[in-house]
Amino acid sequence: MGSDKRVSRTERSGRYGSIIDRDDRDERESRSRRRDSDYKRSSDDRRGDRYDDYRDYDSPERERERRNSDRSEDGYHSDGDYGEHDYRHDISDERESKTIMLRGLPITITESDIREMMESFEGPQPADVRLMKRKTGVSRGFAFVEFYHLQDATSWMEANQKKLVIQGKHIAMHYSNPRPKFEDWLCNKCCLNNFRKRLKCFRCGADKFDSEQEVPPGTTESVQSVDYYCDTIILRNIAPHTVVDSIMTALSPYASLAVNNIRLIKDKQTQQNRGFAFVQLSSAMDASQLLQILQSLHPPLKIDGKTIGVDFAKSARKDLVLPDGNRVSAFSVASTAIAAAQWSSTQSQSGEGGNVDYSYMQPGQDGYTQYTQYSQDYQQFYQQQTGGLESDASATSGTTVTTTSAAVVSQSPQLYNQTSNPPGSPTEEAQPSTSTSTQAPAASPTGVVPGTKYAVPDTSTYQYDESSGYYYDPTTGLYYDPNSQYYYNSLTQQYLYWDGEKETYVPAAESSSNQQAGLPSTKEGKEKKEKPKSKTAQQIAKDMERWAKSLNKQKENFKNSFQPVNSLREEERRESAAADAGFALFEKKGALAERQQLIPELVRNGDEENPLKRGLVAAYSGDSDNEEELVERLESEEEKLADWKKMACLLCRRQFPNRDALVRHQQLSDLHKQNMDIYRRSRLSEQELEALELREREMKYRDRAAERREKYGIPEPPEPKRKKQFDAGTVNYEQPTKDGIDHSNIGNKMLQAMGWREGSGLGRKCQGITAPIEAQVRLKGAGLGAKGSAYGLSGADSYKDAVRKAMFARFTEME
């Protein structure tokens, strides 16, 4: 019996006991299977949100890099990142990848510990190490190690036999493969892989149904298989205090770089590096060669003790996918023109030969023909411009600096200046058609022909240009101003408007002053008065020109107050960044001549007529309103009243020690303002003086009350009104005790019924009072125990009697 198992009260013995145990075991197994299936299903549904916390607690530099870059080879894209990878280990489905997953890590481990451990081994070094964390910042026990190449990852796995020992703990290593994306959908507009639950594109908001209908199958694979090429590479994992010189020193054995080829990104607040930098080379082929050299280095490139990751700097714009599987840059023809214009401006500024290498684009690829055509056109344009400049360099002494029309489409805030011929030079007149034909591909891909019917403008397709503040229409090459609703043609420098009836672009109304230049001045004045006051293209251009000049003048005054006089001319060659938008559209040749320093003799010869100024817009003929011409002429003459060499005000005959004092005198001095007013009026003709006085009267406040007082005099003040007094009406009320108390009252009758007789006192022995009790008034004191006074007051007393009694009581109290 010793071998028999003792059965408890809750356990059933006999033949039913084994059946129950078997049923319990089966139930536990089925429950575990259901739990596993539920876990897999929930993990599939939550795959996009499973590891969001690693992005929340990652470094801001790495977060910005992941947001701005797309990983096409391993399937990392901005909508999914590492959430697209399958973390469940299945040996049969495991495929080689350049990303390795480390599982079973200690909770206290950090990314730096993993990086130091991997750098201690010989062989290929990782490009990036990412530790997955929870929202609390605690490690989740696994991390991802990314290598530059697939061969590096496979050799690392073979060398370590898929096992590591970190902090005394055995770590398992597996290839991290992306999950199949058959349930995801690809946006047809921006080529972004979106989750299957999204009904609209995460980036551009395109409808899912349209993309599924238009995008052919197999497009995703074609996008992943095509490499990305550009002329800029990105350097990641840069130390916070690394400088540009350190980067140049590290890259000097492999490429010849200048300081302007490297851009180190820094934080605006801390002024420390944000962890990455950009290196721009002359062509995409040079960038590709440098990238291959840096990625093949063993050990990898290090700058200030940090292992640097190298890759192409991918643009924020995605690549479009054609049905045949080829990729075309998502930059429209407008963006191509912008790039070509920037190339032209930078070449003219640096003075080097304009050669652009488009060899990285394969012949036959879509877009190759356009880029080749733009390259040829702009090389020809640059050669013509440089040839004209060399021929005119010896003939012209004062060279003006203006911005070209190509700067209209500049995407960066930089100014691309080029020297041009002075107004009216033979070179300029001899080559108007050539410059127009060469600029046509850059500014407008199609051009606008007057009289040709076009489709109705679609403002949703316009692209905003930050440098000019206008919207660019890629179909017509025009710039749209939403405020005035005019279109600007950068080729002809003319304003247009859309005519819905004719379905074409019609030039804005231009003045006819050029046709009637030979008529007498009186007739011109009448025509100007009869001209309607509508805002034409000339007036719009004039307003923007005046606005740009005012901004430039303010900025030049501020800059010149801190600089010597000899650097003034060099400073004036630089355009103001605040007025870049106005000058990029409306500045033409000869704009700087108005701001050149003038000697005092020009003030004495100011009676001579000024030469006609060349308009900033080709369509502007100089025929503007009288007020605008008056203001402009006065402003040009006022600039001659200051000698900036001697620091003297010629109008007030005052000399100052520095430029700042002279500027303050012009802006704040009452004497200068009075003299300027007198000078302005002396320079005006009778008609202009009348117009100015009329304008001042309209702008001045008219005190009509003062005019009335001056005409009719001040009237006498009215007599003050007296207050009306109303006598209160007398009210008859009952006064039974006015004449004394008689025997007819109720109290007297009650006392007589009890045996009381008139004249006797109250009480059993008639010892009480014989007269009735009179009402008395007691004056209020200051508190308890204060001495007060009382005086008799009857209801029949008048106000005068009551006052007399109170006064008498006070008098007796004083005694």
Curated annotation (Swiss-Prot):
Region named Required for interaction with U2AF2: 321-809
Span of domain RRM: 98-178, 231-315
Subcellular location: Nucleus
Annotated region (Disordered), positions in chain: 1-93, 407-468, 508-540
GO CC aspect terms: cytosol; nucleoplasm; nucleus; spliceosomal complex
Annotated ranges, domain G-patch: 743-789
List of residues that carry Phosphoserine: S18, S59, S69, S72, S78, S444, S621, S624
Principal cellular location given in the protein's record: nucleus
One example GO MF annotation: RNA binding
ZnF endpoints (RanBP2-type): 181-210
GO biological process, one term: apoptotic process
UniProt keyword terms in alphabetical order: Apoptosis, Metal-binding, mRNA processing, mRNA splicing, Nucleus, Phosphoprotein, Repeat, RNA-binding, Spliceosome, Zinc, Zinc-finger
InterPro entries in UniProt: G_patch_dom (IPR000467), Nucleotide-bd_a/b_plait_sf (IPR012677), OCRE (IPR041591), RBD_domain_sf (IPR035979), RBM5_RRM1 (IPR034991), RBM5_RRM2 (IPR034993), RRM_dom (IPR000504), Znf_C2H2_type (IPR013087)
Low complexity bias spans: 426-446
Bias (Polar residues) ranges: 411-422, 510-519
Zinc finger annotations (C2H2-type) as residue ranges: 647-672
Region called Sufficient for interaction with ACIN1, PRPF8, SFRS3, SNRPB, SNRPN, SNRNP70 and SNRNP200, residue ranges: 452-535
Family: Belongs to the RBM5/RBM10 family.
PANTHER family on file: RNA-BINDING PROTEIN, RNA-BINDING PROTEIN 5
Assembly and oligomerization: Component of the spliceosome A complex (also known as the prespliceosome). Appears to dissociate from the spliceosome upon formation of the spliceosome B complex (also known as the precatalytic spliceosome), in which the heterotrimeric U4/U6.U5 snRNPs are bound. Interacts with U2AF2; this interaction is direct. Also interacts with ACIN1, PRPF8, SFRS3, SNRPB, SNRPN, SNRNP70 and SNRNP200; these interactions may be indirect.
Function in brief: Component of the spliceosome A complex. Binds to ssRNA containing the consensus sequence 5'-AGGUAA-3'. Regulates alternative splicing of a number of mRNAs. May modulate splice site pairing after recruitment of the U1 and U2 snRNPs to the 5' and 3' splice sites of the intron. May both positively and negatively regulate apoptosis by regulating the alternative splicing of several genes involved in this process, including FAS and CASP2/caspase-2. In the case of FAS, promotes production of a soluble form of FAS that inhibits apoptosis.
Protein name, UniProt field: RNA-binding protein 5
Protein's organism: Rattus norvegicus (Rat)
Gene that this polypeptide is encoded by: Rbm5
